[in-house]
C-alpha cells in the first residue's frame, strides 16, 4: 500500500456524528458486525464503570466467553475520573468520551489491522501522511516491518517505545501484547529529527492498535496465544479536534454548544472571557455529558461507588457555575441540550429524558441548600492569613455541609492554600470509630483474636443445602477466645466441626440457629459465621460436657431455616419486580435476610409511590401463586453471565458459581438457601419503603409465616387503640386526626403564652439598658426562653428603647438540656445604617461557646454548646459592642 499524495490531501471538516458514522461504516464494509454501545454500568462486578472501549469484550479476550462474531466494531461511551483535576485545564482530558473501535476475535491480526488503520486515516478521513507519526513497541519488529514495507511509512516517522508506553496487559497474568499508536503531528514542518511524542502541543495520539498475542504466566513468562486478537481504539473527540481544526477537544461540535450555553447563562462571551472562566465553562460542558449518560444508564447520586462519582460531577458543575456567575438552577436546562446533541447516536437519552432531568433537579436543589452555607464557612476560613485548611475544618465542610474533600481542595488550590489531607483522614477515622462504638452489642461471634488458630483447621464441609441434620466430629472448642479441650454447662463457646448443616452468615443472609446434642449434651447455637470456609458455631452449653473429638448431632431449627429461606427467595423476586415495575437499571446496593424480615437497598432518584409498591406486591404474589420451580445450578461464571444471571457489585466470585434460577422470573448468583417452589412462600408483604441516603432507597418486606405474625400484631394494635379511644376500628384514623388538630391548637396557645412571658420578662429588663454615647445597649442572660421567644422579645425592646438601640440575649432555653444555648442580637435600623450587622456580631459571640449561626443585619440568632462559657461570652459581647458604639 503506497502513501497518499500530500497534494491531494484535504481533510474534510466532519461533524462528530459524521466521524462516528464514517468509522463504523468503514469497518462494516470490511465484514465487521456493528454493535451498540454497552452501558456505562458494566456487567463485570469488579469494575465500577465502563472505562474503555474494549471492556465489554474483556470476557472474550480472557477466554471466559465465546464471541458471537469474529469481527466487531462499535462506538463505546466511557467514563474516567482518575484525571478529573485535568479536565478543562488541558486540551484533551475528559470524564465522558466515546471510543471508536474495531475488534478481531481470533480472526485477522497485525497486517490487516495496520493496513485498515492507515486506509481509514488517509483515505476516509484524508489525513496527510506527513501529519502522521507511528509508535511501535521496540521489540515488535513485525509491526514495524508492516508499517515500513507494506504501508510505506517513512522510517523516520516510526518511533520505538518501551513496554510502559506500548505493551498492553490485563493484569499481572493473562492475555497481553504489544501495541502501535497513530499520532497526528500539528507541526510537520519541524521535521522528523527530534520527535518527542510527549509534546502534546505538537502531537496528539488518535488511534491505538493492541495486538493480543501472548499469555503471561505466574512466573512472568510470555507464551504465544493459540488465537490472537485485535483491540483498537480511536478517540472520537480527538478525531473531531483534528478534522474540525480546533485547538482543543472542547471547541468541537461535540461539546462546544454546551459550553456556549453555559456562557450564555453566565452572561459571558466565551471567546473574550478570561482563562479561569473558560476552564470552568469547559468543566461544565464536559461534566454535563457525563452526568446525562450516567443517569440514563441507571446511576443515582449517592455517597457510594458510582453514585458518588455522579454526585461529585454534579456538584462540580454547580460549583463552577457559581464561579462564572450562574447562581440560579441550570443543570436540567443544560442536560436537555446535551440530550438534543447526542440523541441520534443514543436514542435512549430521549426515552429517559424525564428521569435524567428529574434526578438533576433534585440533586441540584439538595446541594444548593447547603452550598451557600459551606461556601461562606470556607470563605471565612480562607479570609484569614493562612496557608493551610486543617483536617478538622475540611471534615466539618464534608460532614456538615456535604462538601466533597476534592471540592474543598479545588477551591483552596485556587486561593493558593493547601488542605491537611492526613488530618481529614484522621477525623474520618474518628467518626468511623464513634459509629462503630455506638453500635457495639454483646456478640458471641467475636472471633478476631482466635482467627490465627482457626485458620489452621481444614475447611468445614457444608451440607445444609440438602439436609438440616448431620452427625459431625468436634475438632475445635474455644472459650474466652482460647482453645480448650472441653466446655461445661453455662460456658459460652465457639465450636468447629468437620461438617455442618448450619448456614453461616454471608451474602446478606444471617446464620442458622439450632442445637448440638449427644447423650446428655445440649448446646444452643445462636449464630454461625465463617472464616475462609471454616464454620464457627457460637452458643452456650445448656447441659452436659462438650469435648474435643467427640461425635455430635448437628440440628438446625426447621422453622428458623424455613422463615429465613422464604425471605431470601422473596428478596430475589423483589429485585426482579423492581426492575420490571420501576426501571431495568435498578440494582442492589445492600441486603439483609433474616428469619423475621428481608431488607433490600437499591438505587432510585425518588421515593416509590403507593401504586408502585402495590403493583410490585401484586406481581410478586402472582409469581408465588403461579408455583414456579426454583432451580439451583452450579456452572462456570462465564456461562452464568452469558445466561443473564445478576451479580452483586463488589462481590468476589470464583470460576464456578451457584445460580438460583426462577425460570422466566429471576436468575442470580447466590450462595444462600431457598425454597424449592414459589408457592411455599405463601404470601409476600411490603411493610416499609424509605430513603437511607441520597439516591438510595430501602424496602423492608416479609414472606411466608412472618406475614401471619405481622397481621396478628397489627390486629392486636388496632384492638388496643379501639379500646383506648373508645371507638370502632374504622373510626381510629378520624379520632387521631381530631387529636392532632387539638394538639396543634394547644401548641400554638402554649407558644403564645411563652412568648408573652418572655416579652414581659424582657420589658422588665428595659431599665437595665445602659447609655453608650448616643446609643442604648442591653445585654442580659435570659434562661428558659427559646429562640423565637428571644427574637420576639428583642424586637419589642428595640421598639421600646427607640433609636440607636442594641439588644443582646443569651441563655439556656431548656434547663433539662443544659448543653444547648441560644443567642439573639437585635439592632435598630440606624445602627445597621452605621455598619453594624447583627448576624456577624452574634456569630462571633456564639463561637466563644463552641457554636455559630447568623442572620439578617437587624435580627439574628445563633447557638452554642458550652454553657460554662455563656457568662464570659456575654461579658465579651458587652465589651466589644460598647467599644463599637463609643
From Swiss-Prot:
Cofactor (UniProt): Zn(2+)
The primary location reported for this protein is cytoplasm
Can you name a GO cellular component term? Answer: cytosol
Q: Name one Pfam family in it.
A: tRNA-synt_2c
EC number(s) per entry: 6.1.1.7
Binding-site list for Zn(2+):
568, 572, 670, 674
GO MF terms, alphabetically ordered: alanine-tRNA ligase activity; aminoacyl-tRNA deacylase activity; ATP binding; tRNA binding; zinc ion binding
- Keyword ATP-binding recorded: yes
Q: Tell where it localizes.
A: Cytoplasm
Spell out the reaction equation it catalyses.
tRNA(Ala) + L-alanine + ATP = L-alanyl-tRNA(Ala) + AMP + diphosphate
Key words of the record: Aminoacyl-tRNA synthetase, ATP-binding, Cytoplasm, Ligase, Metal-binding, Nucleotide-binding, Protein biosynthesis, RNA-binding, tRNA-binding, Zinc
The free-text note explaining how the cofactor binds reads: Binds 1 zinc ion per subunit.
Q: Which domain of life is it from?
A: Bacteria
Major enzyme class: ligase
Q: Name one GO biological process term.
A: alanyl-tRNA aminoacylation
Q: What is known of its domains?
A: Consists of three domains; the N-terminal catalytic domain, the editing domain and the C-terminal C-Ala domain. The editing domain removes incorrectly charged amino acids, while the C-Ala domain, along with tRNA(Ala), serves as a bridge to cooperatively bring together the editing and aminoacylation centers thus stimulating deacylation of misacylated tRNAs.
The UniProt family comment states: Belongs to the class-II aminoacyl-tRNA synthetase family.
Q: Describe its function.
A: Catalyzes the attachment of alanine to tRNA(Ala) in a two-step reaction: alanine is first activated by ATP to form Ala-AMP and then transferred to the acceptor end of tRNA(Ala). Also edits incorrectly charged Ser-tRNA(Ala) and Gly-tRNA(Ala) via its editing domain.
What protein does this entry describe? Alanine--tRNA ligase
Q: Which organism is it from?
A: Prochlorococcus marinus (strain NATL1A)
Encoding gene (name): alaS
Amino acid at each position: 500500500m503506497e502513501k497518499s499524495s500530500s497534494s491531494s490531501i484535504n481533510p474534510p471538516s466532519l461533524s462528530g456524528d459524521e466521524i462516528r458514522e464514517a468509522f463504523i461504516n468503514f469497518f462494516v464494509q470490511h465484514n465487521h458486525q456493528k454493535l451498540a454501545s454497552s452501558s456505562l454500568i458494566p456487567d463485570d462486578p469488579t469494575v465500577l464503570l465502563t472505562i474503555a472501549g474494549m471492556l465489554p469484550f474483556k470476557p472474550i479476550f480472557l477466554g471466559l466467553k465465546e464471541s458471537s462474531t469474529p469481527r466487531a466494531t462499535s462506538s463505546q461511551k466511557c467514563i474516567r475520573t482518575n484525571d478529573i483535576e485535568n479536565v478543562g485545564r488541558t486540551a484533551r482530558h475528559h470524564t465522558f468520551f466515546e471510543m471508536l473501535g474495531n475488534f478481531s476475535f481470533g480472526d485477522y491480526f497485525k497486517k490487516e489491522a495496520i493496513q485498515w488503520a492507515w486506509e481509514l486515516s488517509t483515505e476516509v478521513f484524508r489525513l496527510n501522511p506527513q501529519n502522521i507519526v507511528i509508535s511501535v513497541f521496540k521489540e515488535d519488529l513485525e509491526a514495524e516491518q508492516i508499517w515500513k514495507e507494506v504501508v510505506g511509512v517513512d522510517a523516520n516517522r516510526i518511533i520505538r517505545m518501551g513496554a510502559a508506553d506500548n505493551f498492553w496487559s490485563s493484569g499481572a497474568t493473562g492475555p497481553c501484547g504489544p501495541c502501535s499508536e497513530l499520532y497526528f503531528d500539528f507541526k510537520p514542518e519541524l521535521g522528523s529529527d527530534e520527535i518527542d511524542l510527549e509534546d502534546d502541543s505538537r502531537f496528539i495520539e488518535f488511534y491505538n492498535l493492541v495486538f493480543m498475542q501472548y499469555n503471561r504466566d505466574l512466573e512472568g513468562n510470555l507464551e504465544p496465544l493459540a488465537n490472537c486478537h485485535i483491540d483498537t481504539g480511536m478517540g472520537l473527540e480527538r478525531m473531531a479536534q483534528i478534522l474540525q481544526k480546533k485547538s482543543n477537544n472542547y471547541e468541537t461540535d461535540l461539546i462546544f454548544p454546551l459550553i456556549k450555553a453555559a456562557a450564555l447563562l453566565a452572561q459571558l462571551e466565551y471567546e473574550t472571557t478570561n482563562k479561569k472562566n473558560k476552564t470552568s465553562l469547559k468543566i461544565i460542558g464536559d461534566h454535563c455529558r457525563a452526568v446525562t449518560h450516567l443517569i440514563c444508564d441507571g446511576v443515582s447520586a449517592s455517597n457510594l461507588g458510582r453514585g458518588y462519582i455522579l454526585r461529585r460531577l454534579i456538584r462540580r458543575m454547580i460549583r463552577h457555575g457559581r464561579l462564572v456567575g450562574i447562581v440560579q438552577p441550570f443543570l436540567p436546562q443544560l442536560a436537555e441540550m446535551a440530550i438534543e446533541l447526542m440523541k441520534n447516536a443514543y436514542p435512549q437519552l430521549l426515552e429517559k429524558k424525564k428521569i435524567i432531568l428529574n434526578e438533576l433537579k433534585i440533586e441540584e436543589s439538595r446541594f444548593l441548600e447547603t452550598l451557600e452555607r459551606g461556601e461562606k464557612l470556607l470563605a471565612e476560613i480562607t479570609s484569614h492569613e493562612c496557608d493551610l485548611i486543617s483536617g478538622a475544618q475540611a471534615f466539618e465542610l464534608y460532614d456538615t455541609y456535604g462538601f466533597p474533600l476534592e471540592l474543598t481542595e479545588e477551591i483552596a488550590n485556587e486561593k493558593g492554600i493547601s488542605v491537611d489531607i492526613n488530618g481529614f483522614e484522621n477525623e474520618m477515622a474518628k467518626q468511623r470509630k464513634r459509629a462503630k462504638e455506638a453500635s457495639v452489642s454483646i456478640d458471641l461471634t467475636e472471633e478476631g483474636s482466635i482467627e490465627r488458630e482457626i485458620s489452621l483447621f481444614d475447611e468445614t464441609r457444608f451440607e445444609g443445602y440438602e439436609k438440616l441434620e448431620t452427625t459431625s466430629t468436634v475438632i475445635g472448642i474455644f472459650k474466652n477466645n482460647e482453645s480448650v479441650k472441653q466446655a461445661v454447662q453455662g460456658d459460652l463457646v465457639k465450636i468447629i466441626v468437620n461438617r455442618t448443616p448450619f448456614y453461616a452468615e454471608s451474602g446478606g443472609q444471617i446464620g442458622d440457629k439450632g442445637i448440638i446434642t449427644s447423650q446428655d449434651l445440649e448446646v444452643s447455637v445462636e449464630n454461625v459465621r465463617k472464616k475462609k470456609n471454616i464454620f464457627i458455631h457460637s452458643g452456650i452449653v445448656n447441659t452436659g460436657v462438650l469435648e474435643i473429638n467427640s461425635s455430635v448431632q448437628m440440628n438446625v431449627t426447621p422453622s428458623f431455616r424455613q422463615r429465613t429461606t422464604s425471605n431470601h427467595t422473596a428478596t430475589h423476586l423483589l429485585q426482579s419486580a423492581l426492575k420490571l415495575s420501576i426501571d431495568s437499571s435498578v440494582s442492589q446496593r445492600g441486603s439483609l435476610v433474616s428469619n423475621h424480615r428481608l431488607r433490600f437497598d437499591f438505587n432510585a432518584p425518588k421515593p416509590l409511590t403507593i401504586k408502585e409498591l402495590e403493583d410490585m406486591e401484586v406481581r410478586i404474589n402472582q409469581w408465588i401463586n403461579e408455583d414456579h420451580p426454583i432451580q439451583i445450578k452450579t456452572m462456570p461464571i462465564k456461562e452464568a453471565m452469558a445466561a443473564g444471571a445478576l451479580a452483586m457489585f463488589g462481590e468476589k466470585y470464583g470460576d464456578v458459581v451457584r445460580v438460583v434460577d426462577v425460570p422466566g422470573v429471576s436468575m442470580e448468583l447466590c450462595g444462600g438457601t431457598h425454597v424449592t417452589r414459589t408457592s411455599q412462600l405463601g404470601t409476600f408483604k411490603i411493610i416499609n419503603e424509605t430513603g437511607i441516603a441520597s439516591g438510595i432507597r430501602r424496602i423492608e418486606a416479609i414472606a411466608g409465616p412472618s406475614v401471619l405474625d405481622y397481621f396478628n400484631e397489627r390486629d392486636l394494635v388496632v384492638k388496643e387503640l379501639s379500646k383506648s379511644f373508645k371507638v370502632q376500628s374504622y373510626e381510629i384514623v378520624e379520632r387521631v386526626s381530631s387529636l392532632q388538630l387539638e394538639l396543634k391548637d394547644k401548641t400554638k396557645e402554649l407558644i403564645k403564652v411563652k412568648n408573652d412571658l418572655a416579652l414581659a420578662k424582657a420589658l422588665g429588663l428595659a431599665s437595665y439598658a445602659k447609655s453608650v454615647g448616643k446609643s442604648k445597649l442591653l445585654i442580659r442572660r435570659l434562661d428558659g426562653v427559646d429562640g423565637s421567644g428571644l427574637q420576639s422579645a428583642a424586637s419589642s425592646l428595640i421598639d421600646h428603647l427607640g433609636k440607636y438601640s442594641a439588644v443582646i440575649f443569651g441563655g439556656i432555653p431548656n434547663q433539662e438540656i443544659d448543653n444547648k444555648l441560644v443567642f439573639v442580637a437585635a439592632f435598630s435600623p440606624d445602627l445597621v445604617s452605621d455598619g453594624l450587622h447583627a448576624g456577624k456580631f452574634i456569630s462571633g459571640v456564639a463561637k466563644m461557646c463552641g457554636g455559630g449561626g447568623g442572620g439578617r443585619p437587624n435580627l439574628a440568632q445563633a447557638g452554642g454548646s458550652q454553657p460554662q462559657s455563656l457568662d464570659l461570652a456575654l461579658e465579651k459581647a458587652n465589651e466589644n459592642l460598647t467599644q463599637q458604639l463609643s
